[in-house]
Amino acid sequence: MVIPDIKTILYPTDLSRHGKKVFSYSEVIAAALGAQIVVLHVVEPLSKQASAVIDGILPSGIDDTGTMHRKGVEALKETIEEEVRGYCIELLGDSSKFDALIKAVEVIDGLCAQVILDRAGKHDADLIVMGTHGHSAFSDMLLGSVAHKVVHRASVPVTLVPFKS
């Protein structure tokens, strides 16, 4: 049997407490295989309903919510990237481990599942390690979930770390 050569692991995070548990799995797998981790945080766009409500409240002459959202995301990307770096360094214990283990830190604006799949392709990820919020199969069927979409559309293996409240 041929053992797969895993060099790059994509770790999408929402920066929650559960994300720290998922990161620890990513770290252990990467260390065992000599791989590096791409850390990804996705900023989702406002829903049409939220945009409509906000646009209805804003006085005329002010940017629409789409423009405001884009400007806000761009302004926050650098701050969020630094927060993600700090989060990873805190979990790893020191910055030298961060430099050796982390290939890239990205903050991308878009729909979570699609961005995860796109970035996995861009970075030639060999594995995606992500959390699931433990919704029931029924709610996943009705609502869908990021993890469910990624598992079914990914061209590489996906390891899911369940959330247990």
Model-derived features with residue positions:
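Structural beta-alpha unit
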Residues: M1-P4, L46, E78, E82, ...
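Active-site phosphate/pyrophosphate- and oxyanion-stabilizing loops and adjacent acidic/basic residues
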Residues: E27, L92, H148
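Gly/Ser-rich helix-loop-strand patches that form or flank binding pockets
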Residues: Q114, D118-S165
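Small/aliphatic-rich secondary-structure junction motif
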Residues: V2-G66
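Short glycine/proline- and acidic residue-enriched helix-loop micro-motifs
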Residues: D63-E78, I102
